[in-house]
Amino acid sequence: MPHSPCLLWLLAVTSLVPGTQPLVAGDLEGDELDETPLPAVPCDYDHCRHLQVPCQELQRAGPAACLCPGLSSALQPPHPPRLGEVRVEADMGRAEVHWCAPSSPVNQYWLLLWEGGGAPQKGPSFNSTVRRAELKGLNPGGAYVVCVVAANDAGESRAPGPGAEGLDSADGPNLGPCGRLTVPPRPLTLLHAAMGVGSALALLSCSALVWHFCLRQRWGCPRRGRPSHAGL
């Protein structure tokens, strides 16, 4: 059967071009697989990690794209942070406060401290990477309420203070920005108190003894009657 002139011409051109190989269907499939992008993974971001690099910087610095947690609008004040562990050092009169970042854009944090029913004391501001801070100058035996506040260009998060709900709840961890803080008395203070109580008891005992002897000297002691001898 005679071949078509066009087909013969195509075969001739293919054989004349050096390095030309016929296309194989498997090669096309391999090229398509190589160009398929890998699925994105979550960024190494922890809301509670101290000195945590912002997630947007992790996206730019990483070799591959990663996913950041969703955030609220930057045009709104941030959601309240979540207060974490509070470690008290009674000997030093200080406490270390830990918190977790909210799912909101944050520029800075600070702590508010209430003692009794007085006005809150505002601590220094910390940048958005900080998740841990110290409270100093706490009184031994004092009771406080501490709140974490987050702020951005649109405003600051709400800090209910001593009137917050769930401060005294024992059902589970505190999920709000505030918590109660109690500083136990120092060991030396307890020792001094014990010595004071012991001294007071000793003084009271001595006073009772002196009073007893004074009464004996004043009224005299009752004399016992001599025993009567019966018979010779």
Swiss-Prot record:
Residues 211-232 are cytoplasmic. Its main location: membrane. Keywords: Glycoprotein, Membrane, Signal, Transmembrane, Transmembrane helix. The chain crosses the membrane at residues 190-210. Residues 1-22 form the signal peptide. InterPro entries: FN3_dom (IPR003961), FN3_sf (IPR036116), Ig-like_fold (IPR013783). Residues 77-172 form the Fibronectin type-III domain. Residues 23-189 are extracellular. Glycans are attached at N127. It is a single-pass type I membrane protein. It is found in: Membrane. It holds the Pfam family fn3. GO terms for cellular component: membrane. CDD domains: FN3 (cd00063). This is LRRN4 C-terminal-like protein. It comes from Bos taurus (Bovine).
